[in-house]
Amino acid sequence: MQALMSDIRWLGLDWDEGPTPEKEDPSYHQSNRYPLYTAKLEQLKSMNLAYPCFCSRRDVRTMASAPHIGDAGAPYPGTCRNLSPEEVRERIREGKKYSWRFRSPDTPYRFTDMVYGPQTATLQECGGDFNLQRSDGVFSYQLAVSVDDGDMGITQVVRGRDLLPSTPRQIAVLEALGYAVPQYAHIPLLLDAEHERLAKRHASLSLESLRQDGVSPWRIIGLLAWVAGITDRREPVHPRELVSSFRWESLPRDDYVLTSKDMQWLGKENMNVC
């Protein structure tokens, strides 16, 4: 966490509140927020919006071998959704492990993404009843980030467009718990030559690696600004210089494939983006 924040600050970016590279803030660690997540899960249970699911990971993987729907994968078919209280108690007595899933309503969720425009989707289209807490007690991403956003009063969420299918799920949790729903902006991804999303296997393109190799942070920002349509050419630039030129509507919707020219610009001429 500290190294990540240090890399972000090296890029010339800063933030208004929260931990810093010099000072941690335990309230921002999800591992310290389990009591809050537990209370919110209990609230969903009391509203009959959460139910125990006894399906194993193997069961879910088998279900996922069915034809996928969109980017969210195969929907969970609700195998345990309508178990009677007696059936639930019997399975618990038998020692079967269970997770907790959100009971998805049939109604569509609508929101306007600041980049991709109006969106409408049912939770079934986004994977069906989703996990809130795993059988080992770990809270799911969907519950944790929704509660964090609501509890901290987050008004704008900016992230990669691969998380667009998660948005209706998070809106459902936020609304069920009485939280305000933030604005969402999903941005296109950087891809390698094989059109795969940049990931851990591209370690040489991590901020830490680029920084260690002596790449100028202003060149990184300049490349990203050009890709995002904020500037009309690659040129070194400080983030502060881009603030007045930034417009959500100028952002492209298509992912960007990094090229050899981009590597040359960053001073990484001998690297293949694959």
Language model feature labels by segment:
Residues 3-11, 34-39, 70-80, 203-207, ...:
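Short, structured secondary-structure boundary patches
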Residues 11, 90, 107, 196-201, ...:
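Non-catalytic terminal extensions that flank enzyme cores
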Residues 21, 56-58, 187, 223, ...:
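Residue-level "edge-of-site" marker
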